[in-house]
Every structure is written in C-alpha cells, then in structure tokens.
C-alpha cells in the first residue's frame, strides 16, 4: 500500500496496553488500538497517557492504527531557557 493512501489523524493517548500497544482517542471521538511505528521504537521515544500523537490509519481497516509521531506539549519543559 502506498503512503499516499493512508489517513493521518491526530489524537491523545488514553491508555497504555501490553506489547507496545496504546489506546488512542482520535479528534473525531473514536477510540482505536494502535501500535508504535518502527522508527519510534528504534529511537526509544517515550509515549505516555495524555500525550498528543499523530496516527496513521489504513482506509481498508479503520479499527487499528499506527503511531507515527509524538507531538510536543505546549506546557512541557522540554526547552528550558536560562
């Protein structure tokens, strides 16, 4: 399947499930179980409940997704200036 055919939506992580799975509430209100993409797993990106993420869905199966990006929280202290 081409990358062009995939649907990108944003949502927030509501629950952490076993084996790198997460339950994500999408912006349209649906909840879908998702897994982490390979690049996120390889780079050890930490995803916690409450994080905003970008999810990729297949047009053939909208019941499962893949987390492809963790969005920065505006209130996080990732960038501390002195």
Curated annotation (Swiss-Prot):
Pfam families: eIF-1a. The lineage of its organism: Eukaryota, Viridiplantae, Streptophyta, Embryophyta, Tracheophyta. Belongs to the IF-1 family. Component of the 30S ribosomal translation pre-initiation complex which assembles on the 30S ribosome in the order IF-2 and IF-3, IF-1 and N-formylmethionyl-tRNA(fMet); mRNA recruitment can occur at any time during PIC assembly. GO terms for cellular component: chloroplast; cytosol. Keywords: Chloroplast, Initiation factor, Plastid, Protein biosynthesis, RNA-binding, rRNA-binding. One of the essential components for the initiation of protein synthesis. Stabilizes the binding of IF-2 and IF-3 on the 30S subunit to which N-formylmethionyl-tRNA(fMet) subsequently binds. Helps modulate mRNA selection, yielding the 30S pre-initiation complex (PIC). Upon addition of the 50S ribosomal subunit IF-1, IF-2 and IF-3 are released leaving the mature 70S translation initiation complex. This is Translation initiation factor IF-1, chloroplastic. It is found in: Plastid, Chloroplast. GO terms for molecular function: ribosome binding; rRNA binding; translation initiation factor activity. Residues 1-72 form the S1-like domain. It comes from the Eukaryota. It comes from Cycas taitungensis (Prince sago). Its main location: plastid.
């Amino acid at each position: 399947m081409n990358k062009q055919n995939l649907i990108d939506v944003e949502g927030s992580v509501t629950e952490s499930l076993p084996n790198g799975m997460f339950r994500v509430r999408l912006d349209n209100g649906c909840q879908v179980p998702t897994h982490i993409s390979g690049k996120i797993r390889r780079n050890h990106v930490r995803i916690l409940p409450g994080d905003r993420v970008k999810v990729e869905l297949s047009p053939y199966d909208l019941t499962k997704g893949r987390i492809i990006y963790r969005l920065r929280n505006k209130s996080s202290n990732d960038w501390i200036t002195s």
